[in-house]
Every structure is written in C-alpha cells, then in structure tokens.
Amino acid sequence: MAAPTYYTITFGCQMNRADSERMAGILESLGYVPAEDELQADLVLFNTCTIRDNAEQKVYSYLGIQAQRKRKNPAIKLIVAGCVAQQEGERLLRRVPELDLVMGPQYVNRLGDLLAQVEAGNQVVATEPVEIPEDITKPRRDSRVTAWINVIYGCNERCTYCIVPLVRGREQSRQPQAIRAEIEDVARAGYREVTLLGQNIDAYGRDLDPKTNLASLLRFVHSVEGIERIRFATSHPRYFTEELIATCAELPKVCEHFHIPFQAGSDAVLKRMRRGYTQERYRQLIQLIRQYMPEATISADAIVGFPGETEAQFQETLQLVQDIGFDFLNTAAYSPRPGTPAAEWPDQVPEEEKSDRLQRLNRLVAEVAAARSARLLGQVQEVLVEGPNPKNPRQAMGRTRGNRIVFFDGDPEQLQGSLVPVRITATRAFSLSGEIVKPGEEKPQAAELGACT
C-alpha cells in the first residue's frame, strides 16, 4: 500500500515558513511523504497569513479549489493552520465546511494529536490559547544550507494596526538549552547558517525565569561547531540595546545585517500606531549600529497611508528613507485588519492616495538601494552558496553576509553550502553579479571575512 501524501502551501512571513517546516516534519514522522502537486495530495495543509487582506483572499481562492476536490473524494484531508485559522476559527468551517482541521499557530507542535482526532472522524477547531510545547520532531527544512530556528513565539506589543498579537498570542521564549540543541542538530546535518526567528526577537528572554536576553543567547550559541553564520529577525527598535549591538560587533559569526522595521517617519503617525519610539530614536539607533559596524546592512518595513496620515507626514517617511540609506525596505499600503483599533478609525486614507504614496516610496527605495549596492562594485565578498540562479540554472546564487543576493558562474550543485570569495562585477538595487576569486588572486579583506558585510 502506497504511503499517504501531503502538500503544504505557505503564505506570509519567515515564522510561517519555519512553522510549515516543523509541521511537514511531523507529517513525515506519521508516515506521510511529500506530493509533487497539491492536486494529487491526500492531505493539503494551508499555513496562512492575515497581516494584509490580499494574503487572506489568496487563501480562500486556493481553498475553493481544494473543497471541490474533497467533495469528489471525501478521503482527502484539508487543514488550515496559521493566522487566518486563529482569527476565523469556527467561522472558517462555516465558510468552507469541507475542512477537517482549523488550527492556530500555537498548535503547530500538536499537529499529530489533532490529526488523530481527525482520523477518529472529528472535525477539529484548535484556537484556544495554549502554551507551546517543545517538539523533538525534526522539521523538514526547505533549504539544505540555512535553517530557521524559532526562539520566541508571540508578541506583547499592541500596535494599533497589527493583528499578530491577537492571532499568535503572548510572548513565549524557548529555553536557551533547547535552542542550542536544535542548532547543534542542524550543524550535524551540514547546515552552515542559522536564522533565529521571533516576531520581536530582541524581546527574547524577558519572560523566562531567570530572565535573559538576545545578547546572552547569541553568546551561548555562538560556539556551536559547523555553524559559520548567525542571523536574527525581526527586531523592534524599542528593545534593540547597545549591549545587543556591541555583542553583534564582537561575535564574528553574527551577521551585520539587521532588519528593524520603522513603519513611519512621522512622530504623529508613530504615536497613533502605538509603536513606542520616535523617528529621532530610530535615527539614533541606526547611527549607533553604524558606529560599531560601519558596513552594516540595514533593512526595514514601512507602511504608507495609515489612517490620518497627511502628505506632509508621508514626506517625513521619504526623508527618513533618504537620510538612513536603507539597503532593503519592505513596503506596503495600510490594510485594515478586523479587530484592530485603526481599522475602526474614520480618517481612512483613500485607496488611490495610498497607491500613489506606495509608488513614490518604492521609487525612492530603489534609488537609495541602488546607490548602496554600487559601493560594493569591485569588492570581494564572502558568499554562502544556496543553489542555482532560478533564472539561469547554469549559474550559482548565494548571499553575502549582509544578505545581498549574488549571481555568478559556477556549478551550483558542487558549490552548494560552500563559502566562496566573489568579486562584485555588477550591482543593481537588490542583487549583485560577480565572479569567483580563484586561489592566489586577491582575497577578501579580514574585515569582510570576519564580520558580516
């Protein structure tokens, strides 16, 4: 008898990708094997995102197709996990009665138990707040080079636009020993890089007894043999301390790429967002990072068209982007999320105005990023090879320690997982091209090898 097959479809953030890898590992421990096509799978799992409306609507579009399959073949199992599942709960079953299991993010490690209930003939909704247990099942990781490692779940912030605290629950930090054990496991499996994940990762450890922090965790895991690079995301400006900055500058494996969302450049908008800092505090933070690590790569998130945002306030966002000089910036027009305070405010910005502001911001972002990239022309960068260039399989693709994508000639299969010196021969806003530096030729400077640039 053939083994049952599964297929996962993941929407949203890195946390969701890490959760999907863990759920895939659980399914394989139960005897499932991956399907090549979601239309052929015996079990289809949607790991959903509700941070913006368009992501949520994509979920329902996919669900409609799978519901038709299930009506023809009731043996198919349909699961919706993640933030849409947590937000909608029973309402999701009423909208798509073909579903077998609706489960929030806090239940990822309990998937096996929930599936047992489904196998017993039950339609299950699991969205009640629970503590997230440690799970010894190995995730089925998508990459063979870099591994996602969850270190803190949930969020205690109350930003007026954000649904995350409502759907992912309060902060729950993992024990340092459990995190190190997982990193040691991926190192033994041949991984060279880990990315530590959390909604607000720099809040790590304040809920533990005894309390600890992200700087201490980085020191604790830094000595794991085999791991060459350590990254972390996503950071909140309020918790990004000088101790953390100094620790990152000191530890050679910790990459000098920092993702720190600012969301808006106007203090008035930041106050309405309930972000807990000013644009001047954000500027000072980035300045301090660059004092310790002048070549640090800085990325962020920004929202345009927040309720009540004026043109003058939007101009402050443009000015901040220009002044900081971001290397990457994730931008979005404000999307009202049900259950958040900002969604109920009367001073919503018209859609056409939001679209116009987003286009103007994106143009500036591309200009600034292109100028930042151009500084690397002719430099030799250490690149961790991830695999083939998706658009040219004969080329290899990898990332610098500053998280810039680099394309270069080479055998992707042979080089995958290797750290290679690459001279940058062409720069673009969000990617680079280069050539491998052969033995005996110019090598990266010590600063480029010893720290993430």
From Swiss-Prot:
<dbReference type="InterPro" id="IPR038135">
    <property type="entry name" value="Methylthiotransferase_N_sf"/>
</dbReference>
<keyword id="KW-0963">Cytoplasm</keyword>
<feature type="binding site">
    <location>
        <position position="49"/>
    </location>
    <ligand>
        <name>[4Fe-4S] cluster 1</name>
    </ligand>
</feature>
<dbReference type="GO" id="GO:0035596">
    <property type="term" value="F:methylthiotransferase activity"/>
</dbReference>
<keyword id="KW-0479">Metal-binding</keyword>
<keyword id="KW-0819">tRNA processing</keyword>
<protein>
    <recommendedName>
        <fullName>tRNA-2-methylthio-N(6)-dimethylallyladenosine synthase</fullName>
        <ecNumber>2.8.4.3</ecNumber>
    </recommendedName>
</protein>
<dbReference type="Pfam" id="PF04055">
    <property type="entry name" value="Radical_SAM"/>
</dbReference>
<keyword id="KW-0411">Iron-sulfur</keyword>
<dbReference type="GO" id="GO:0046872">
    <property type="term" value="F:metal ion binding"/>
</dbReference>
<dbReference type="InterPro" id="IPR002792">
    <property type="entry name" value="TRAM_dom"/>
</dbReference>
<dbReference type="InterPro" id="IPR023404">
    <property type="entry name" value="rSAM_horseshoe"/>
</dbReference>
<dbReference type="InterPro" id="IPR007197">
    <property type="entry name" value="rSAM"/>
</dbReference>
<dbReference type="Pfam" id="PF00919">
    <property type="entry name" value="UPF0004"/>
</dbReference>
<keyword id="KW-0949">S-adenosyl-L-methionine</keyword>
<feature type="binding site">
    <location>
        <position position="162"/>
    </location>
    <ligand>
        <name>[4Fe-4S] cluster 2</name>
    </ligand>
</feature>
<dbReference type="InterPro" id="IPR006463">
    <property type="entry name" value="MiaB_methiolase"/>
</dbReference>
<comment type="function">
    <text>Catalyzes the methylthiolation of N6-(dimethylallyl)adenosine (i(6)A), leading to the formation of 2-methylthio-N6-(dimethylallyl)adenosine (ms(2)i(6)A) at position 37 in tRNAs that read codons beginning with uridine.</text>
</comment>
<dbReference type="Pfam" id="PF01938">
    <property type="entry name" value="TRAM"/>
</dbReference>
<feature type="binding site">
    <location>
        <position position="159"/>
    </location>
    <ligand>
        <name>[4Fe-4S] cluster 2</name>
    </ligand>
</feature>
<feature type="binding site">
    <location>
        <position position="155"/>
    </location>
    <ligand>
        <name>[4Fe-4S] cluster 2</name>
    </ligand>
</feature>
<dbReference type="GO" id="GO:0051539">
    <property type="term" value="F:4 iron, 4 sulfur cluster binding"/>
</dbReference>
<keyword id="KW-0408">Iron</keyword>
<keyword id="KW-0004">4Fe-4S</keyword>
<keyword id="KW-0808">Transferase</keyword>
<feature type="binding site">
    <location>
        <position position="83"/>
    </location>
    <ligand>
        <name>[4Fe-4S] cluster 1</name>
    </ligand>
</feature>
<dbReference type="InterPro" id="IPR006638">
    <property type="entry name" value="Elp3/MiaA/NifB-like_rSAM"/>
</dbReference>
<dbReference type="InterPro" id="IPR020612">
    <property type="entry name" value="Methylthiotransferase_CS"/>
</dbReference>
<dbReference type="GO" id="GO:0035600">
    <property type="term" value="P:tRNA methylthiolation"/>
</dbReference>
<comment type="similarity">
    <text>Belongs to the methylthiotransferase family. MiaB subfamily.</text>
</comment>
<dbReference type="InterPro" id="IPR005839">
    <property type="entry name" value="Methylthiotransferase"/>
</dbReference>
<dbReference type="GO" id="GO:0005737">
    <property type="term" value="C:cytoplasm"/>
</dbReference>
<comment type="subunit">
    <text>Monomer.</text>
</comment>
<feature type="domain" description="Radical SAM core">
    <location>
        <begin position="141"/>
        <end position="372"/>
    </location>
</feature>
<dbReference type="InterPro" id="IPR013848">
    <property type="entry name" value="Methylthiotransferase_N"/>
</dbReference>
<feature type="domain" description="MTTase N-terminal">
    <location>
        <begin position="4"/>
        <end position="120"/>
    </location>
</feature>
<feature type="binding site">
    <location>
        <position position="13"/>
    </location>
    <ligand>
        <name>[4Fe-4S] cluster 1</name>
    </ligand>
</feature>
<feature type="domain" description="TRAM">
    <location>
        <begin position="374"/>
        <end position="438"/>
    </location>
</feature>
